[in-house]
Amino acid sequence: MFQPAAKRGFTIESLVAKDGGTGGSPGSGGAGSHPLAVAASEEPLRPTALNYPHPSAAETAFVSGFPAAAAAGAGRSLYGGPELVFPEAMNHPALTVHPAHQLGSSSLQPPHSFFSAQHRDPLHFYPWVLRNRFFGHRFQASDVPQDGLLLHGPFARKPKRIRTAFSPSQLLRLERAFEKNHYVVGAERKQLAGSLSLSETQVKVWFQNRRTKYKRQKLEEEGPESEQKKKGSHHINRWRIATKQANGEDIDVTSND
């Protein structure tokens, strides 16, 4: 069976005295010097992460391969922009890079990083991307043409038509023309538009709306009973045609008998 190795006991005073006796000069006191004096002459204690030597050329080349330049061993972010570097880490005395390593890293640093200033310019997209309604709002107004999202694309919305405000005299003339004829086309519409200082499109739209209103008012005046009579008479006429009967006495289609 393996036997556990004997533990070695030592104290801080013995280590300090040993280092002072072997590394010191003959006139510095040697092994008989005071432990506090020897400790004061030593290099101040640092955390373990700060006691590493300067990076080698291979390490510097590895770091310089990333978008960020190897100007510092730590405190440098992945992006190469100077605004993303921590100022506390750059000013720390233990994180400075040796001049020789700076020269080596400058030759190995890529010429352009992805996040450099030239890549921050407005991106150029294909026209079909800009015309798409679902992607156009994600880009800035400077990148998107003004007519790219309104007049193009299968789902683009047409601009709303401005409603014309007619004067009382124009409405009176239009109503009189509608009483004479519900459809005004050709030279008659052109003459009416010229006399009212309107365009032919405005006159055409007004007549379309007026015909729709007229049909709706007519249906409201007749009521549901007249509509039922029309449907009943239609079925009776079809029955008479099918049975080849002459028009005799009228049949009341609204009776409940």
From Swiss-Prot:
Composition-biased stretches (Basic and acidic residues): 217-230
Record-level GO BP terms: brain development; brain morphogenesis; cerebral cortex development; cerebral cortex neuron differentiation; cerebral cortex regionalization; homeostasis of number of cells; in utero embryonic development; neuroepithelial cell differentiation
Tissue: Cerebral cortex. Expressed in the olfactory bulbs.
Keywords assigned: Developmental protein, DNA-binding, Homeobox, Nucleus
Domain of life: Eukaryota
Principal place of residence: nucleus
Subcellular location: Nucleus
CDD domains assigned: homeodomain (cd00086)
Keyword presence, DNA-binding: yes
Binding partners and assembly: Interacts with WRD11 (via the N-terminal and the central portion of the protein); the interaction associates EMX1 with GLI3.
Family to which the UniProt record says this protein belongs: Belongs to the EMX homeobox family.
Role according to the record: Transcription factor, which in cooperation with EMX2, acts to generate the boundary between the roof and archipallium in the developing brain. May function in combinations with OTX1/2 to specify cell fates in the developing central nervous system.
The name this protein goes by in its record: Homeobox protein EMX1
Organism from which the protein derives: Mus musculus
Phylogenetic lineage: Eukaryota, Metazoa, Chordata, Craniata, Vertebrata
